[in-house]
Amino acid sequence: MKSAYYVPNFPINRITQTGEDGWCHMPNHPRSRYDYLGAILEHMDNSKRIDPIQIIIYDEQQVHAGPSGVSRLFALTHQRQYTHIPCIVSSEIQYDWFGDNVVKINTTEELLSYFDPNYLPKSYSLDNGAFWHNGAWTYEELERTMNVSEATKLRMKQMMTETN
């Protein structure tokens, strides 16, 4: 049975499956054209926080990111050259390489405390580790939750219109 852990400085080089979507490498994809990753980074900069990436560890050779947070992971590693990120890890073992200040998560209140209170996950569970899903944004959620400039909000709305 997996437990959930908050790992404030998870080593990215331990991730064997980053979960990134193919669009990250397609310059003509709407998310690329409208600079979705830039909007994510702008939001993190303005919020002065990075919400955790979801990690599931099956064994030390199978460390999977996602589904929640894979765009954040891609933006932080490829545009900001991060080597460690905050994660919520589901694993049967608390590995030494998780580093310092690891916190075992026992309740949904503890799980939700690691997220921006203005944009809590739409669904979540602590059954056999931690799972959450942010879900697809609506225009109203975008307005309420994205801490970005009006120009970026407009760009993201245009992207949503094109992709929905």
Over which residues does each language-model region extend?
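Amphipathic, charge-rich alpha-helical segments that serve as recognition/docking helices
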Residues: 90-164
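General helical structural elements
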Residues: 18, 37, 76, 148, ...
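Polar low-complexity intrinsically disordered regions enriched in Ser/Thr and small residues
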Residues: 22-25, 41, 69, 102, ...
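Short alpha-helix boundary/capping and kink motifs at helix termini
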Residues: 1-65, 77-78
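Intrinsically disordered, low-complexity N-terminal regions enriched in serine/proline/glycine
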Residues: 4-5, 9, 33-35, 57, ...
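Short, structured coil/loop segments at alpha-helix boundaries
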Residues: 28-36, 87-90, 108, 149
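A short, basic-hydrophobic beta/loop patch
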Residues: 49-111
